[in-house]
From Swiss-Prot:
UniProt EC number: 1.1.1.-
Sites where the protein binds NAD(+): 12-36
Keywords for the protein's UniProt record, in alphabetical order: Oxidoreductase
Family as reported in the entry's similarity comment: Belongs to the short-chain dehydrogenases/reductases (SDR) family.
Gene Ontology molecular function: oxidoreductase activity
Gene3D superfamilies: NAD(P)-binding Rossmann-like Domain
Active site location: 157
Name under which the protein is recorded: Short-chain dehydrogenase reductase 3b
Binding site for substrate: 144
One Pfam family it belongs to: adh_short_C2
Length: 257
């Protein structure tokens, strides 16, 4: 489909300062959206907004584990632009790989607080804003192949993403009567700062590892591929799609369950 697929849409992207989030900010604004970048990485987030143009993107500091800050981020967006059409809840963390015998419960709590509870808070307040304005909006959440397959990521991360998939399904059921869609986008291993730092690997090593275990050969998974899937779910092209988890994994989760 040609043309600007989010023309006139107002979007919040959490975790928008780097990685998949930053790539999505760029792609969404290319397609006509005005985006509020939500993150705790202030310098990076502000730099992304400036590089795109502050008429198209703005930055708002928000810790997703703090519900008051989440509510304020949504209020900021609605006050600035008059509405909210799309939430791309992408903020997340990944803890170190350890045996379940050595599981650090503090790390587990932090991962779940950001990846799952933070997303729940944003869905709650974004949906409220959409309902109040009569917006038939779209909510997209970054899940993972780890949302359905164990053994590909640390225990806390895997647990949080399994829970997030349940939240997506539950929220889609509760928000359908308002015309609000809720979906997930589930990438395989992308060489983002989050993954590289979490696994202590250089980007080329992450890509080599992903390509070696991938089902689909001859292509390297990039953040742009995930952003393009999120764009589809955010746009009206997916107008009758809700409660789904769109895998961007080259068939990995199908052939290696």
């Amino acid at each position: 489909m040609s043309g600007k697929r989010l023309d006139g849409k107002i979007v919040i992207i959490t975790g928008g300062a780097s990685g998949i989030g930053a790539e999505s900010v760029r792609l969404f604004t290319e397609h006509g959206a005005r985006v509020v970048i939500v993150d705790v990485q202030d310098e990076l987030g502000q730099n992304v907004a400036v590089s795109i143009g502050e008429d198209k993107a703005s930055y708002y500091h928000c810790d997703v584990t703090n519900e008051t800050e989440v509510e304020n981020a949504v209020k900021f967006t609605v006050e600035k632009y008059g509405k909210l059409d799309v939430l791309f809840s992408n903020a997340g963390v990944i803890e170190p790989f350890v045996s379940i015998l050595d599981l650090n419960l503090n790390e587990l709590d932090r991962t779940i607080a950001i990846n799952l509870r933070g997303t729940a808070a944003f869905i709650k307040h974004a949906a409220r804003a959409m309902v109040e304005k009569g917006i038939r909006g779209s909510i997209v959440c970054t899940t993972s192949v780890a949302a359905e397959i164990a053994g590909t990521a640390p225990h806390g991360y895997t647990t949080s993403k399994h829970g997030l998939l349940g939240l997506i399904k539950s929220a889609s059921g509760g928000l359908g009567k308002y015309g609000i869609r809720v979906n997930g986008v589930a990438p395989f291993g992308v060489a983002t700062p989050l993954v590289c730092n979490g696994f202590k690997m250089e980007p080329n090593v992450v890509e080599q590892n992903t390509s070696a275990s991938a089902n689909l050969k001859g292509i390297v998974l990039k953040a742009r591929h995930v952003a393009e899937a999120a764009l589809f779910l955010a746009s009206d092209e997916s107008a009758y799609v809700s409660g789904q988890n769109l895998a961007v994994d080259g068939g990995y989760s199908v052939v290696k369950p």
